[in-house]
Design a protein with these regions (language model features):
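Phosphate/NTP-binding elements of NTP-utilizing enzymes
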Residues: 1-237
């Protein structure tokens, strides 16, 4: 689905609020449809074959920027995402171990899911580990952050800090600086709602994220940990 050029120049909900009502009314149905597809998935004809993809898969294909631009539809990925939905729906499941070949797109797919889940979750934390701290950082800065930056404004929560952070992507309301002038004039601050959700990465180690509650942890290149670090010990953490 082609992204409307008229909406491309709108970067935040605050920009959207500045537009006239007649402009916004023209796009309400389009935006509602995108939220429906994100939640329920999408059906289409693939070379004449009726095909269903999950909402998470749709977000990856439609709204996730990867190294080659837009992702291609692959049947293997469609099955992967259906299985992933089964994992999330099963309370007995702790996650997925995915053995793959090279260039299968898993790093981008997991990055897209981190952003997808983080932007609809409140008071949550999402993490990244890889075979080394530098690899985890690279996944964060080169994959997760660009996907978040290129989300359309209607999927993009209020964000604190830089547009392209190096260590933490924080979907929360930026702290407001209380100045003497504001206190003396009793200036009313605009109340904004934020998700209070973050995505970050850590250096590789047995105790990485020890004692921290994560809603989702992406273990990239988890079979390549180098001694003395052992992913089995980290899994028990």
């Amino acid at each position: 689905r082609e992204d409307p050029k008229e909406l491309n120049r709108i970067k935040s909900r605050f920009d959207w609020e500045e537009y006239p009502s007649d402009f916004k009314e023209k796009w309400y149905d389009y935006i509602d449809d995108e939220f429906t597809r994100r939640e329920q998935g999408f059906c289409f004809y693939n070379n004449g074959t009726p095909t269903y993809i999950t909402g998470t898969h749709y977000m990856y294909l439609q709204w996730s920027k990867i190294d080659v631009g837009a992702p291609d539809f692959r049947e293997a990925n469609r099955l992967f995402y259906i299985f992933w939905e089964a994992c999330k729906a099963d309370n007995r499941c702790y996650g997925m171990c995915y053995l793959k070949n090279r260039r299968s797109g898993f790093s981008f797919m997991s990055s897209a899911e981190l952003v997808n889940q983080a932007t609809i979750s409140s008071d949550a934390r999402f993490g990244i580990l890889s075979k080394s701290g530098s690899d985890a950082k690279k996944m964060f800065t080169d994959k997760v952050v660009p996907i978040s930056v290129n989300y359309p404004f209607f999927f993009k929560p209020i964000q604190d800090g830089m547009d392209r952070p190096k260590t933490e992507l924080a979907y929360r309301v930026p702290a407001s600086k209380l100045t003497r002038r504001k206190l003396e004039s009793n200036e009313q601050l605009r109340e904004l709602d934020g998700l209070d959700t973050t995505i970050d990465w850590k250096n590789t180690g047995d105790n990485s994220y020890d004692g921290e509650k994560l809603k989702l942890l992406a273990h990239d290149e988890s079979g390549k940990w180098e001694r003395p670090d052992n992913i089995l010990n980290n899994w028990r953490v």
